[in-house]
Amino acid sequence: MTDDELQTLFEDATSDYAMCESDAALAKLARATAAVSESFEAWHALAEVNFSLRRLDAALAAADRAHALRPQDLFINTTLSRIWMERGDKARAEHFGAQAKIGAWKDQLKKPDQQAGGVK
């Protein structure tokens, strides 16, 4: 699958999800992850769609794959925190929530000029 084909598939899945066609979105994201197993975006999207449907086991499996690809990513750590909270594991939820906060702080330290003016 070419990068353009993957992007089109990903955009179609996003559109399907926005139109409340979750099964179609999940099928397209499954095709994307099968074709390009190192696609962080596809795994993260698969985790989020499954989470929204309360398919927590599938959401966790997809989120774990995305996390393995980008363990420092703010958004996947936030997703994992939300999944673990829904599963009732507060300690793991707090762990991933803390990782997300640490990542955000590191990003702020890398770009102090963007923080100088505060929120506008």
Task: Please place each PLM-identified region on the residue numbering.
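Long, contiguous interaction/recruitment modules in multidomain scaffold/adaptor proteins
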Residues: 1-4, 119-120
